[in-house]
A protein has these predicted regions:
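Beta-rich, blade/repeat-based domains predominating
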Residues: 35, 60-71, 108-119, 153-176, ...
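A short beta-strand motif characteristic of beta-propeller blades
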Residues: 52-58, 100-106, 147, 154-160, ...
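Blade-loop segments of beta-propeller domains
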Residues: 53-119
Length: 370
């Protein structure tokens, strides 16, 4: 009888281990507030939203945006420090959450606010510099010297915000053939042909798309089927929907993230799709501090499904966990991450009551533990 009981116990234990879905949650911050020490790594259980602190990497200046390197073995962080701005490379041990500093390279463009990485290159979007910086990746994961610096020129109609180019995001297209670059200062989205082995000509400008004057394009995300792209505007709180095909963006819809009659201040920030591709979420700071929920309809068009207060101030960044069950909002000014549960059928958000206390969080990245 003891032997018969032994095997079910083992099976239950194995099932429990198989069902436990832990990810690393990596948090970038602004250290110049005096409330943060650098880059934080937490263990996040996607079954329960339980969070456990793992590591803190200190002495990193303003790591305000992060990118996970290919193979989950490196992390790249911008150092958003005005004229001394740089990008730092770290080795990453996913099991322990430990980051090991490898090296740092100047971006030669002030205030990098976005970074991406693939197998060959690391690319930063430099806001105040109005430029894009390209670095190679060494075998160790360290950064090469800068390979290419692309500077934008021009301005738009908002004299306070758009007196010069302000590159806010650089992102690969789904086919990885092009780079999409959002320029808040010029009200344009640029498309570059991407040649990863191109030496000092990794990027070659292909085209640009003009956005509504005064809109302030900030972040863009592609649909799950790669046929559509959704661009959020920081200044006017709008979203432009494009059809996408082989490096070409064609506008098909304009909408907004605010309710009718809104008279407050916009500060549209981040935009993400649910993992199943059925819902789009967008955050607004300013006087709103809300997440707007959209359903993605036939033909990639958006329809509003609701508006949810984020329960904090300054939702600069948010992330949906890989299972799609939870949406986490990083509040820059109230120094916490609020965890919402997401209804997979309706897209609705419900506060779990769970919080992560961390100083000036502005970037959330999920990464596998193994």
């Amino acid at each position: 009888m003891k032997k018969l009981l032994f095997f079910p116990v083992i099976m239950l234990a194995l099932q429990s281990c198989a069902q436990k879905k832990d990810y690393n949650l990596i948090v970038g911050t602004y250290t110049n507030t005096g409330k943060s020490e650098g880059i934080y790594v937490y263990d996040f259980d996607t079954n329960t939203a339980a969070v456990k602190a793992k590591t803190v990497t200190k002495n990193v200046e303003n790591p305000s945006y992060l990118a996970l390197g290919d193979g989950n073995k490196a992390i790249y962080a911008v150092n958003e420090t005005s004229e001394t701005s740089a990008v730092s490379a770290f080795g990453f041990d996913a099991a322990s959450g430990k980051l090991t500093f490898l090296n740092k390279q100047a971006t030669n463009g002030a205030d990098p606010c976005y970074v991406i990485a693939d197998k060959k290159n690391v690319i930063t979007a430099n806001y105040s510099g109005g430029s894009i910086s390209v670095f190679g990746i060494e075998k160790s994961g360290a950064l090469s010297a800068i390979k290419q610096l692309v500077k934008h020129t021009g301005k738009s109609i908002d004299k306070a915000r758009q007196g010069s180019a302000h590159v806010h995001m650089a992102q690969f297209t789904p086919d990885h053939k092009y780079l999409v670059v959002d320029d808040l200062g010029t009200d344009k989205v640029y498309l570059y042909t991407y040649n990863p082995d191109g030496g000092n000509k990794v990027l070659t400008v292909k085209d640009s798309v003009a956005i509504t004057p005064g809109a302030g394009p900030r972040h863009l995300v592609f649909s799950k089927d790669s046929k559509y792209a959704y661009l959020i505007h920081e200044i006017d709180g709008g979203i432009t929907v494009f059809s996408y095909s082989d490096g070409n963006l064609t506008e098909i819809q304009k909408t907004k993230i605010t309710e009718d009659g809104f008279k407050g201040e916009n500060g549209a920030a981040d935009i993400h799709l649910s993992p199943d591709g059925k819902f789009l979420y967008a955050s607004n700071r300013g006087s709103e501090n809300k997440i707007t929920i959209f359903a993605i309809e036939k033909g990639g068009l958006l329809s509003v499904r609701g508006y949810v207060p984020t329960l904090g101030k300054g939702p600069r960044n948010f992330a949906i966990d890989p299972t799609g069950k939870y949406l986490l909002v990083a509040h820059q000014y109230t120094n916490d991450v609020v965890i919402f549960e997401r209804n997979l059928e309706t897209g609705a958000l419900t506060d779990t009551g769970k919080r992560i206390s961390v100083g000036a969080p502005v970037c959330l990245v999920f990464a596998p533990v193994k």
